A protein has these predicted regions:
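A conserved FAD-binding loop/helix module that cradles the flavin
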Residues: 763-788
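Glycine-rich dinucleotide-binding loop and its adjacent helix/turn
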Residues: 454-475, 534-554, 578-632, 737-753
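Flanking helices and flexible, charged tails adjoining ferredoxin-like Fe-S electron-transfer domains
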Residues: 331-384, 445-481, 500, 504, ...
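FAD-site-proximal beta/loop scaffold in flavoenzymes
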Residues: 587-610, 694-767
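Beta1-alpha1 glycine-rich phosphate/pyrophosphate-binding loop at the start
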Residues: 393-396, 402-403, 444-448, 484-552, ...
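Iron-sulfur cluster-binding cysteine motifs and their immediate structural context
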Residues: 72, 76, 83-85, 103-112, ...
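Short, amphipathic alpha-helical interaction segments positioned at domain boundaries
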Residues: 115-154
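Ferredoxin-like iron-sulfur electron-transfer modules
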Residues: 88, 119, 270-283, 299-328, ...
Length: 923
């Protein structure tokens, strides 16, 4: 039996069965034992359960094994030498050697003075295990090679990674930094620069598929990347890849394009590290979620297996906690923390324990490193604004850019999370401001007003910002068709983020125009239609197709769309229906829901009302209905709500504006019945509300039925909730409905019981705000991308977007700008009380500079140097010159040949053992 491992394969998930009872092929046993680096497997006969056996047995014939057994690992042999060793003729050998090379059991080069072709039996990793996995058809026919590759990057290492010194001891791969990140480093070595290796192998480059991406996907743990062309063979390896149908030649310019696209995606550059400092044969662009090489440092928590000579450091004074470095750091070395000191001084952040002076075993590993490395924030918290925003926009970052006059950069930063900043600058409920630390001193920073100013650029075609498409593919835009049902903020947001990933989604909207509740549920005096249209135009420029006047479930079904080639669906139709009160008389003429009123007026601002109007409800929608009623001609408007004045759901600002316009508000009552005459409402009888919630905290109002008042009226507008109107959309689908007829879905992926159907926005959460829908749309796009890419995990390495607010009660706030909060002016040419035009102006540029200076700069990124692998990806994402690489670990650039690995390991191991003993004595 094979030696037990601390991290066994989950055989239930393998795309094949391990042939444990197979009759052993002796030549394969010998070959596996000869090549493996796994010490236990060298000291005993292989069994059918050993990956060295079943991996080779699946693809290597006995004839191939015969030849390979006459060779030695990594010892080149020319054809004449192989002829002599095997006794076969050259005519017999050449086609066999070619086949062995195409399969991946052999490689070849011309690295000798005569430039004579010589064949090499490579080690498993890096070597034949990768080569086996560079051909899709071969993987399909021999899926065993995928798990073989995975095992050979784990089993030989699980007992030695803690003993590997800086530089990697000639094992596997080695991180090489982003070139731009070390251009100004005077002490850098040539071998630390990608440009050095490209010059060394000038004119000899080939691009091939990534074996990690291919094999992991075949095992059901794909990352959603297109695997083709991310790995670059250099020198003679380029010829080998091309001649054995694993790659194609590329030019220097194409190499640079691949490297740039890799950096755009946050992939890590790595070079082979088994031939010393004078040779590499590949430059890989690695995704940590699938890379078997990066796993050697991340899973075992042994960074020496990967790290370069560089460590990232944050310049705290420049950092604004935008979180871009955090999102892309492959090692989870950067997290958001705080810049402001606590009352007892700066926070001292924990560091990852290292194996240098500690016994190291499975209890020190991070089996779930792909998820742990996506933790965004230290438990002690970070900037409250970023935490409170449902979309977690980099508020502190765009305020700093605005303060510097970098308005376009600020807009670009916002649009990494929010495609509708101009819309949100007018109607957001501003949870960021509610959480703002400045509000504990005087007044919160006017974040939304600053965003509105920044986003004005989007309203002009000449100045609008259209983000670049960044997709994890080098093969052009994705071909998969995706349908989004519903053109509101969730659906449009999903479409936007899919477009940024290289898709061309189609939005189906039943109304004449897109926008959903933004257009049909928010009056123009708060959000003008041209603002909505301007930002939707940007989606169209990105390639989003919007088909209006199409009700899915009626004109066309989901089944029809599937038949038309659509691979995934995002249902985001919102809560477009209004709820009734369930009291006598509510079917009378003159009674309508707020949703209906707002939709009617959204279509026709000349809609007329007259007489006395009562609006039932206390939220922002009720406020909108009241204000719209006055603009439509109502003589008087009274709002009635269950809540006390200080408990009304509507914002204080909205309440104040409504009252200023003439709306009367009566709190603490609910409808008992509607009085009618000749089928028309004439009055509403109200009953006193005595309580809102039951002992479990659920909304369950109680009343005193004897304490009533009667309000005469000619119109009633019900704003007591919204409902989902599914129509025939779900007919024949497996989508399940839960409370309030909302769709039941996975809380992380938003995937329903119908696997290709995802949901988002109000149909999942119930009625919420636009920014909630926007955040949900982005997560929907993440899920759909993972779903439509073959064999991709829906959750592994997924950013869960969890943030924590710093303790505002434990801050030592020093000097700060004492400027008061700025207020935007009102256009005096507009009748702000009765016009449907938006009278609110934006802040002036002078005001924006003054307002952004009020930001206290609460948050900052924090690097754990014990986790940093020195890739430099973080530096490519920072737009504040706040994070740089420093050459703190020059010993990590020591490259040795694989054959000399123990010459490097043994001295380090001895020193480590002494440290461990001293550490024990110290305890």
């Amino acid at each position: 039996m094979s030696k037990p491992t601390a991290f066994p394969l989950d055989e239930s998930k393998l795309p094949f069965e391990i042939p444990k009872d197979a009759v052993l092929r002796e030549k394969i046993v010998k070959l596996g034992q000869m090549i493996t680096d796994r010490i236990p497997a060298k000291n005993r006969p292989l069994t059918a359960e050993d990956p060295e056996y079943w991996g080779l047995a699946s693809i290597v014939t006995d004839e191939m094994a015969d030849v390979a057994l006459k060779m030695k690992v990594r010892k080149p042999m020319t054809l004449p030498e192989i002829v002599k060793a095997t006794g076969k003729t050259a005519e017999e050998l050449e086609p066999l050697l070619y086949k062995m090379s195409c399969v991946g059991l052999l490689e070849y080069n011309w690295e000798n003075p005569r430039r004579e072709k010589q064949y090499v039996l490579p080690m498993f990793v890096p070597g034949s295990a990768e080569f086996f996995n560079m051909n899709k058809q071969q993987i399909a026919e021999h899926p065993e090679v995928t798990a073989f590759f995975e095992r050979m990057t784990f089993l030989p290492l699980e007992h030695i990674t803690a003993m590997v010194p800086p530089g990697g001891a000639g094992i596997g791969m080695h991180v090489i930094p982003v070139e731009k990140a070390i251009e100004t480093e005077n002490q850098s070595l040539d071998i630390e620069h990608i440009s050095h290796w490209l010059k060394k192998y000038e004119g000899k480059y080939a691009a091939g598929p990534c074996s990690c991406r291919m094999s992991r996907a075949a095992m059901g743990e794909g990352c959603g990347d297109d695997p083709d062309d991310w790995c670059i063979g250099v020198g003679d390896m380029a010829d080998y890849l091309v001649e054995t149908h694993k790659g194609h030649y590329i030019t220097y310019d194409e190499v640079m394009q691949i490297l740039q696209k890799a950096e755009d995606n946050g992939f890590v550059h790595q070079i082979t590290n088994i031939d010393g400092e004078n040779k590499i044969f590949a430059i890989c662009n690695c995704n940590v979620n699938v890379c078997n090489a990066l796993r050697t440092s991340q899973l075992f928590n042994t960074p020496n297996m990967s790290r370069s000579a560089y460590v990232a450091k944050v310049e705290k004074e420049n950092c604004v906690a935008c979180g871009r470095c955090v999102e892309y750091c492959p090692a989870g070395a950067v997290k958001l923390g705080q810049k402001l000191c606590t009352k007892s001084g700066p926070i001292v952040y924990p560091r990852q324990e290292l194996p240098d002076a500690t016994k190291w075993g499975p209890e020190k590993w991070a089996i779930d490193y792909r998820d742990k490395n996506r933790i965004n924030c230290y438990d002690t918290g970070t900037a409250p604004c970023k935490t409170a925003c449902p979309a977690h926009i980099a508020v502190q970052g765009y305020l700093k850019m605005a303060a510097q006059g970098r308005y376009r950069d600020a807009l670009a930063l916002i649009k990494k999370e929010n495609p509708f900043p101009a819309v949100c600058g007018r109607i957001c409920n501003r949870r960021c401001e509610d959480a703002c630390t400045r509000g504990t001193i005087d007044q919160a920073v006017a974040i939304d007003a600053a965003k509105k100013f920044i986003a004005q650029q989007d309203l002009n075609a000449e100045s609008r910002y259209v983000p670049p498409v960044v997709q994890p593919s080098l093969q052009g835009l994705w071909k998969q068709k995706i349908a989004i049902i519903g053109g509101g903020p969730a659906g449009l947001s999903c479409a936007y983020f899919l477009a940024l990933q290289g898709y061309k989604p189609t939005v189906f909207e039943k109304n004449p125009h897109p926008g959903g509740m933004l257009r049909y549920g928010i009056p123009s005096f708060k959000l003008e239609k041209d603002v909505i249209d301007a930002e939707i135009e940007i989606l169209k420029e990105l390639g989003v197709e919007i088909r209006c006047g199409v009700e899915v479930g009626k004109e066309v079904t989901l089944a029809d769309l599937r038949a038309d080639g659509y691979k995934a669906f995002y249902l985001a139709i919102g809560c477009q229906g209004g709820r009734k009160a369930g009291v006598p008389g509510e079917e009378a003429a003159g009674i309508q829901t707020a949703v209906n009123l707002l939709r009617t007026v959204g279509d026709d601002e000349n809609y007329k009302m007259s007489g006395r109007t009562v609006v039932i409800g206390g939220g922002n929608v009720a406020i909108d209905a009241a204000r719209v009623s006055l603009r439509c001609g109502a003589d008087a408007v009274t709002m009635v709500c269950l809540e006390p004045r200080d408990g009304m759901p509507a914002s204080a600002e909205e309440i104040a504006e409504a009252e200023e316009e003439g709306t009367a508000i009566r709190c603490g009552y609910g409808p008992k019945e509607f009085v009618t005459e000749n089928g028309h409402v004439t009055a509403v009888v109200l009953k006193k509300c005595t309580g809102l919630y039951n002992p479990e905290g659920r909304f369950a109002p109680t009343y005193d039925e004897n304490d009533t008042i009667t309000l005469p009226c000619d119109n009633v507008v019900l704003s007591i909730g919204q409902c989902i109107e599914w129509g025939d959309l779900l007919d024949g689908e497996a989508v399940e409905l839960g409370r309030g007829q909302g769709a039941v879905a996975d809380p992380v992926t938003y995937q329903t019981a119908q696997p290709d159907v995802f949901v988002g926005g109000d149909v999942y959460t119930g009625p919420r705000f636009a920014i909630d829908a926007i955040a949900a749309g982005k997560q929907g796009a993440v899920s759909i991308h993972r779903f439509v890419q073959p064999n991709t995990s829906m959750t592994i390495g997924r950013n869960r977007r969890e943030f924590f607010e710093l303790d505002k009660g434990n801050l030592s706030i020093g000097e700060y700008d004492h400027t008061p909060r700025q207020q935007a002016a009102v256009d005096e040419h507009i009748d702000a009380h009765r016009s449907f035009r938006d009278a609110h102006l934006t802040l002036t540029e002078t005001q924006v500079r003054a307002e952004t200076a009020r930001c206290l700069g609460c948050g900052a990124s924090v690097v754990d140097p014990n986790k940093c692998i020195g890739c430099g990806v973080c530096t490519t994402k920072c737009e504040f010159d706040a994070i740089h690489l420093h050459r703190d670990l020059p010993q990590c650039s020591k490259m040795v040949k694989s054959e000399d690995k123990f010459k490097a390991i043994l001295p380090y191991m001895a020193k480590r053992e002494i440290k461990i003993r001293f550490a024990k004595k110290g305890k």
